[in-house]
Amino acid sequence: MKRKIALLLITGICLANTVPCFASPSMKVSVSSSEENQYSTLPDGDTLQKDVGFRPKAPASLAGGYLFGSGNITESFDLDSNGAPVNKQKGISFKYIKKDNNTSKSVSLSAEPASGQSLSSNASVIKYGETDLYYSTAEANSLAWIDGDVRYILMDINK
């Protein structure tokens, strides 16, 4: 367990730079898109710009021997007081896989525009240089940060 936490922290630190943040009072909903919007190979910056409207960092591998496995476009939005979707935006979710003998482990790295996003208030905050890293175990072991205008979440989906 401590190794997983350390791996999440190290990988997050490698990808993080600066962290401004902004709070949103409405409920956030995220939805993964259909299979037609999936990537079997790592997309380049131009493809991501065209597909989701921004250029998130998209490393081929992560610390600890995790390699790109797949990716898909996500859509997130807030719900207004009537339950109608507002503030729709696209994001990206990449799955990284590590294979050891007969065991396969995976982590997820997601990115979406940071505008109007808040980071978990239940998380432990770890300062790394100028970057605040938010570690949480609420849904899974996750590490979140904002770099420029992109919000990243690294999640251990094996929990």
Stretches found by the model and what they are:
Residues 148-159:
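Surface-exposed amphipathic alpha-helical segments
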Residues 1-26:
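Sec-dependent N-terminal signal peptides of Gram-positive bacterial secreted proteins and lipoproteins
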Residues 27-142, 146-147:
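Short, solvent-exposed recognition patches
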Residues 8-9, 103, 157:
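Intrinsically disordered, low-complexity segments enriched in polar/charged small residues
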